[in-house]
Amino acid sequence: MKVYVIDYHKDDPKKCTGRKLVKLKLAELTRVGRGIILNPFSERTLSINDKDILIKSGITIIDTSWNNTSQNEFKNVRGEHRRLPILFAGNPIHYGIAYKLSSLEALMATLYILDEVKEAIKFSNVVKWGHTFIELNKELLEAYRNKDEEEIKKIEKEIIEKILRK
């Protein structure tokens, strides 16, 4: 499985998990999208149906800052754009905030949902808080794991409705 990172150099280099993956040779820096493109603005939700894409072509993470990001940074990147369902950040910068995942967290979530749990856990060792993300989202990740897009959207809708009722 290949992991690619497109780096827009908008993050603090010391906190940038995409760059860390490249530095550790766990990902390859690229300017071209390949395989699954993790895109928080995509209409399509990642699901087990995307596993063949992961195996054949890999996954591309677009590393940018949540403070300065827009759809424009994603729309010109070729590949199969997918968004992740609701998950909560475990990183120290956005801890507990829905959808505001680091590049590493997005990668771990993708692997977990696509039933590559051992790989997700392997990547969680890259940073001190990696296991925090997995533990914080364990119930959600297990609910999404190995499910098709419709099932994941249904689960996500139920979770959001439950949160809004509180």
UniProtKB/Swiss-Prot annotation:
Q: What class of enzyme is it?
A: transferase
Q: Which cysteines are joined by disulfide bonds?
A: none
Query: Which organism does this sequence originate in?
Result: Saccharolobus islandicus (strain L.S.2.15 / Lassen #1)
Q: Which Pfam families match?
A: Fer4_RLI, Ribo_biogen_C
Cell compartment(s), UniProt: Cytoplasm
> Which regions form coiled coils?
none
Q: Which domain of life is it from?
A: Archaea
Entry EC number(s): 2.5.1.157
Any one GO MF term held by the record is:
S-adenosyl-L-methionine binding
What does the similarity note say? Belongs to the TDD superfamily. TSR3 family.
Q: Please tell me where this protein is predominantly located.
A: cytoplasm
Protein's GO biological process: enzyme-directed rRNA pseudouridine synthesis
- Gene Ontology, cellular component aspect: cytoplasm
Task: Enumerate the UniProt keywords alphabetically.
Answer: Cytoplasm, Ribosome biogenesis, rRNA processing, S-adenosyl-L-methionine, Transferase
Q: What is the lineage of its organism?
A: Archaea, Thermoproteota, Thermoprotei, Sulfolobales, Sulfolobaceae
Give the protein name, as stated in the record.
16S rRNA aminocarboxypropyltransferase
Query: What chemistry does it catalyse, as a reaction equation?
Result: an N(1)-methylpseudouridine in rRNA + S-adenosyl-L-methionine = N(1)-methyl-N(3)-[(3S)-3-amino-3-carboxypropyl]pseudouridine in rRNA + S-methyl-5'-thioadenosine + H(+)
Q: Read off the InterPro entries from this record.
A: RNaseL-inhib-like_metal-bd_dom, Tsr3-like, Tsr3_C
**Where is S-adenosyl-L-methionine annotated to bind?**
T17, I62, L84, Y99, S103
Q: What does this protein do?
A: Aminocarboxypropyltransferase that catalyzes the aminocarboxypropyl transfer on pseudouridine corresponding to position 914 in M.jannaschii 16S rRNA. It constitutes the last step in biosynthesis of the hypermodified N1-methyl-N3-(3-amino-3-carboxypropyl) pseudouridine (m1acp3-Psi).
